[in-house]
């Protein structure tokens, strides 16, 4: 049996009671934190709460050589992930691999950043369009900096339908956790290059450390927000589309947004 367990958003205490019981009953416990991680804890704290050794897996262990799956043929194996366990396509692929090997699987869900963002900002979850991810720039063969324009295009498309865009920020082994500030600067660089009016007067909302006791939620114009101090990671970004009057009020009251956004409402 292979049980996928979502750990929630921030620390070891975000796990559900059902998830905690499954971990305690498991013969082996594995975890991966390269798709998402819990910034308020570490493996040692998890092991103390769970009473079990947590074996950390690399990207290669999960995606290329998941030999550890064989243990689930005749043992109870728990696989831990940040957030909700099936939001990442990596985990869907892993589940399908297990099923093809004849291994029974089950899911125990956890809190997801996609629902937490709606709760923290007041933006209605059914008004979100396609999400986007901003990677760090890379250097071309000619030595020039290459910035992905795909997130800009996604925001543009969603905005044309009045929809909000949830923007995931890169987690890089060498460069670390991308901040809201870097993400906005990259989007504004693309705006400067293309001049299509997507980001120059756009309202954005930055969220830091969702799930913690003191998350930061700040709304403002992208140009202004890029200088705001969001503090430690993890960060995530939202670029709202057309605002319902309750959403606009929430951004002003709950995210310290500018009063002018009350004018851009349905």
Curated annotation (Swiss-Prot):
It comes from the Archaea. GO terms for molecular function: diphthine synthase activity. It catalyses: 2-[(3S)-amino-3-carboxypropyl]-L-histidyl-[translation elongation factor 2] + 3 S-adenosyl-L-methionine = diphthine-[translation elongation factor 2] + 3 S-adenosyl-L-homocysteine + 3 H(+). It is an enzyme of class 2 (transferase). InterPro entries: 4pyrrol_Mease, 4pyrrol_Methylase_sf, 4pyrrole_Mease_sub1, 4pyrrole_Mease_sub2, Dphthn_synthase. S-adenosyl-L-methionine binds at residues 9, 84, 87, 112-113, 169, 210, 235. GO terms for biological process: methylation; protein histidyl modification to diphthamide. CDD domains: DHP5_DphB. Keywords: Methyltransferase, S-adenosyl-L-methionine, Transferase. Its EC number is 2.1.1.98. Pathway: Protein modification; peptidyl-diphthamide biosynthesis. The keyword S-adenosyl-L-methionine applies. S-adenosyl-L-methionine-dependent methyltransferase that catalyzes the trimethylation of the amino group of the modified target histidine residue in translation elongation factor 2 (EF-2), to form an intermediate called diphthine. The three successive methylation reactions represent the second step of diphthamide biosynthesis. Belongs to the diphthine synthase family. Homodimer. This is Diphthine synthase. It comes from Methanosarcina mazei (strain ATCC BAA-159 / DSM 3647 / Goe1 / Go1 / JCM 11833 / OCM 88).
């Amino acid at each position: 049996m292979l049980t996928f367990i979502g750990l929630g958003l921030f620390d070891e205490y975000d796990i559900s009671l059902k998830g905690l019981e499954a971990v305690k009953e498991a013969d082996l416990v594995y975890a991966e934190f390269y798709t998402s991680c819990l910034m308020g804890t570490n493996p040692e704290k998890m092991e103390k709460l769970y009473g079990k050794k947590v074996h950390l897996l690399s990207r290669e262990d999960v995606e290329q050589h998941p030999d550890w799956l064989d243990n689930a043929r005749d043992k109870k194996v728990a696989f831990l992930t940040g957030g909700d366990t099936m939001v990442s396509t990596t985990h869907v692929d892993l589940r399908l691999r297990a099923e093809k090997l004849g291994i029974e699987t089950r899911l125990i869900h956890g809190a997801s950043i996609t629902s937490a963002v709606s709760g923290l900002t007041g933006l209605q979850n059914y008004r979100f369009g396609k999400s986007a991810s901003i990677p760090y720039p890379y250097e071309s063969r000619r030595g020039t900096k290459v910035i992905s324009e795909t997130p800009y295009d996604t925001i543009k498309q969603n905005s044309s339908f009045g929809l909000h865009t949830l923007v995931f920020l890169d987690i890089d082994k060498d460069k670390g956790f991308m901040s809201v500030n870097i993400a906005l600067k990259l989007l504004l660089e693309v705006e400067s290059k293309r001049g299509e009016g997507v980001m120059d007067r756009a309202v954005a909302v930055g969220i830091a450390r969702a799930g913690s006791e003191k998350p930061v939620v700040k709304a403002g114009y992208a140009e202004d927000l890029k200088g705001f101090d969001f503090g430690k990671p993890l960060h995530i970004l939202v670029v709202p589309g057309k605002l319902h009057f309750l959403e606009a009020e929430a951004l002003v009251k709950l995210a310290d947004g500018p009063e002018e956004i009350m004018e851009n409402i349905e």
